[in-house]
Structure formats: structure tokens, C-alpha cells
Amino acid sequence: MFNRILLLALLLSLPAWATKPPKKKDYLVRLSTNFGTMHLLLFDQTPKHKENFIKLTEQKFYDGLLFHRVIEKFMIQGGDPDSRKAKSGDRLGNGDVGYKIPAELDATLFHKKGSLAAARDNNPEKASSGCQFYIVQGRVWDDEGLKTQMARSGRSFTEDQISTYKTLGGSPHLDGNYTVFGTVIDGLAVVDSIARQPRDEANRPLNDVRMTVSGKWVKKKKITRQFGYSY
């Protein structure tokens, strides 16, 4: 009897991200900045990254951190814990949480505009940072540019990739090298606004771009109805 009570107490003490997610719901991320708010979803195909991002979000880890590296027509990067109290001109990008996440590369998840992906250092396993991430802005590509990218990488793009990169845009040279684990479903204009900010020689915005990140489990039908996202 005591063991059952102890087990029940442990289960009740677990945070929301540690329990089995409800089948008919998804975790809706709200990322607010001084340039507006984005809503994002995390992919089930990358469970380790999804669980980790939910964990950090529930812990309020990202609140007050900066988008410390922004490059127009490429991406915006944030999640460095050292950025919370960084002074103007401080070099950022090396802060972490002391662990990496094994790569979860999926050919169906590529670097289209709005993709949420894990930053990483140069390691042969392509393991991801435990906390730093980037959101793709990229650019629109033509056939010639995509052929060049395929030749350089030695990989072929799917019809879906080619069509998406020619219309929505993205950063195809990152495919297969970094784990894409989510997507912006609302607020792409915010990505554009942040990406075009004046920056220093290290690509840090001259004016701080801070984030607040929260999330909640929402019925998938409601997400589809509110944001037009199809599962």
C-alpha cells in the first residue's frame, strides 16, 4: 500500500512535460518579443527535442533571453542563457545547459521559412545544443540556385522541398545538418522584423530583442480552426 501511495505521489509531482501527452492535443508555444508574438508547434517526429523544449518552456528558462544573432535572409538565433544579463557589446553564443540532444534528422522536416531548429557546435554526431535554437527566415530560390545547392551537398531535394523553397523560401544548405523540430504557424512577419534589425559585427542586434516563451496543451481541432494548421 505504501509503495502505491509513493508512486501516486511521484506521478502527481511530475511537471506537465514529463507525462504522456494527450493524443487529441498539441503543445502550442507562444513566443513573445518586443517586435510581436509568434505561435509555434513542435514536431512529434523529433520527440527528444520536443520534450526538451517543453521542459525548458515550463521552467521559464527562455524568459528574458535574447535573440543574440540575426542575419537577414538567413535566420534568427536565441536561447543562450548568458544573454539574460548581457551588456551591450558582449559576445554571445557559447552559453548552454550542460548537455546535448542526440540529432533527430528527418528528411521530411527541412529548413523552410518559419522552421524551428536546434543550434549546435561542430561535432560529428550533429548533436544539438540543449537550449539554443534558431528560426529560419531564408530567401526564395530559383531552379538554378537549388541545383547548385544539391550539387554542393550531394543530395537531391524532394518535390515538396523544391516547391516550398521556390515559393515560401528557406535555407536549404542547412538540410541534413541540423535538427528541425518545429515550425512557426503564426507570426512570420515577426521573424522578418527581427531579422532586419541593425546589428554589430557579431550579428548581435544593436537594440536587444528579448523573448518570453510560454506554452499549453490545446486541442488540435482548435489549433486548426484558429491558425489554419493541418495535421
Predicted stretch roles:
Residues I5-S13:
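Sec-dependent N-terminal signal peptides
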Residues A16-Y231:
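Cyclophilin-like peptidyl-prolyl cis-trans isomerases
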